[in-house]
Amino acid sequence: MEYRINQRTGDRISVLGFGTSYIAEAGERDAVAAIQRAYAGGINYYDLATAEGRTFPYFGAALGAVRKNVFYQIHFGADYTSGTYGWSTDGETIRRSIEWQLAQLKTDYIDYGFIHCIDEFSDWQEYQRNGAFDYLTRMKEQGVVKHIGLSSHTPSTIQRVLDEVSVDMLMFSVNPGYDYQKGDYAKGSVDERSAIYRRCEAEGIGISVMKPFSGGQLLDAAISPFGKALTQYQCIQYALDRPGVLTVLPGMSSVAQVEHLLGFFGATEAEKDYSMIGSFSPAEAVGKCVYCNHCKPCPMGIDIG
């Protein structure tokens, strides 16, 4: 496993994290086994924006005994009071959901408490007006929340929220399709998305990556916006090469999936090389750096790491 340091918090975070969007489908036994295999493999960062509330007791069972060794990214606005995911900006609803989540996780603190899914600036205004942000900041003041984060798909909204509030982590959708305006959540121009990476890097805000495979589209030539398939390892490397990125959070629901993704660290450079996207990227990508490092040192003077 490889780790990167969050410059604002000092946390040492695994570059491969654990996404939970569909883990509930696996059932408790398989889910717990997958989570424990991830932990054994060095994964220490877990996102808890999941489709089903029953995911939380799985994590309580799997990681309750080693809670101090892992980081939970928990979303203030993801409502599980009905048993399944719902989005809410109501402070009281969020309070009930968070208290339930903590009980199921067998913990009394949250490493990263996230302002959840703010895709329009009006969402942020509603989040403040309805008491959600007040509740989050109160939990931070009480020490229940250690650090505050923001999740969004929209670069222009991210910029405006970051102008108003200090956060230590940003959850952002990162993959070559979205970066070149291809896909359902491909929001913002190439330059707007690049500006987010650069701002986060400059200000020490860590980026945790959601949707690294564009919901599986990039892995299937038949539905890829490029007409060709990428591998999971190529997509992970692409995301890790963006400025500011600390960890990539693919969804996992089985031991086999976890082991395959952990195989990234034993893969050859050729297996992780995504430089070929330059041969089939959309027209708007022409002339834009994709940080593949193959022209290093950059003839245009871009810092490509």
Task: Annotate each PLM feature.
Residues 26-29, 36, 40, 86-208, ...:
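Glycine/proline-rich, positively charged
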Residues 1-76, 80, 141:
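N-terminal binding-site loop/beta-alpha segment at the start of enzyme catalytic domains
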Residues 39, 43-44, 191-305:
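Structured C-terminal cap/extension of enzyme domains
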Residues 6, 18, 46, 59, ...:
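Conserved, mostly hydrophobic/aromatic
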Residues 16-29, 76-95, 121-125, 220-229:
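Active-site mouth loops of central-metabolism enzymes
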Residues 69-73, 166-175, 269-275:
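Short hydrophobic/aromatic-enriched beta-strand-loop microsegments
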Residues 21-23, 49-51, 75-79, 115-118, ...:
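Active-site beta-loop-alpha junctions enriched in small/polar residues
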Residues 44-50, 146-150, 247-249:
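Short catalytic-loop micro-motif centered on adjacent basic/acidic residues
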